[in-house]
Amino acid sequence: MDLYCWNTEISAAFYVVLQFCELSIRNGAVEAVEAVFGPNWHLNRGFVYTLPVLRGNRGYQPRNDLQSCAARLPTAGKVVAELKFAFWQSLFVKGQQARIWDTHLARAFPGYDRALTLAQARTQMFDNIEKIRKLRNRVALNRPGFIGDL
């Protein structure tokens, strides 16, 4: 029981910080996408078709998620709020480097490590978002935090 209580306390401590991380990443990504595809980026077919589609319909499908949200929600703001965190991570794949990040990474994420190339910074962002996403899911699902590194 002590470990369960400790895990609950650790999860609560991480929750607010993880929410701020998610919002910061999401808002930076939205800023960059809007700069390239305009304020109605969620309806822009040119943008939609740049999103990855996993073969065999296995795993998270960012294109399908965006199309589903855009079809039922009236504004970009509502779409932004509804998209999964994995959607924002999917924008940091190599295929979006020249399209979005070469020209907008520094403005959207001014604190990035400038010792890195833009491609390295984008890759680092993807990897760090993956760590944040996994920790967030552990916290949200109340999985034991005392197993493995926090």
Task: Give the ranges of each region predicted by the language model.
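Amphipathic alpha-helical interface elements
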Residues: 1-150
